[in-house]
Amino acid sequence: MTLAAKLIVLVYVALCFVNESTSQDHSNIYHETLTSLHHKGEFHVKGLFQTPVQYAGDETVLDLYVKKNSGGDVKAVYCLGNKRSIMNQFTDTGTTTDGYDLWRVKIESTPEHISRMISHGPIACNLIWEKVITPAKGNVAEIKGLDLVNFNVNFPRQSTDNVVSRPSTNSQTVDKLLNDTLAKARGVPMSVSVISGICAIILVIFPIFITIANLRRVYLH
């Protein structure tokens, strides 16, 4: 084989290698699968990983697209197992041209989460939804209440994999989630239920101490 032929073969092999590497990188970096999650006809959620978890640093960015079909507003998006508070974990980046609210959620990339995501295991997430109920009759003002939507996030291995799916069971309740996370985000050291319990104990024990003190005073005199 002549020197020119050898050079042509080497260039061809190099181009094939570069093309294969680029294709693999592109398929690993961009996951644009959008899986819709409907919730009682009020809204639906689509999930999108822009960067793979194995290439991420401390956090993996997940884009959640939420379209509202009724009154209300999304107050927070939270993925369980994350050390960040609710208020610091998500970013509202505005509304897209097709009517979706884009929420950028940062999922903590610990070794446990990386292993779970790569093995296509679900990460449990919650969406806190402030529902607005307009009474049908009368001049009663709008009623607002919180609703918690549970869903799973899966890191896709191929374009047909679901990013967002329904959980098998509800792992959290609104009260527990708000007490455990929102209170910490606002700097409240204890939940309302704990404070109420302490106050109740004090109210029961305090009269007993007063009675004992009075009896001791009478006995000494």
Swiss-Prot record:
The chain crosses the membrane at residues 192-212. It is found in: Host membrane. It comes from the Viruses. It is a single-pass type I membrane protein. Coiled coil: none annotated. The keyword Membrane applies. Glycans are attached at N19, N179. Residues 213-221 are cytoplasmic. One of its GO terms (cellular component) is membrane. The keyword Glycoprotein applies. Residues 24-191 are extracellular. Residues 1-23 form the signal peptide. Its main location: host cell. Keywords: Glycoprotein, Host membrane, Membrane, Signal, Transmembrane, Transmembrane helix. This is Putative transmembrane protein ORF25. It comes from Ostreid herpesvirus 1 (isolate France).
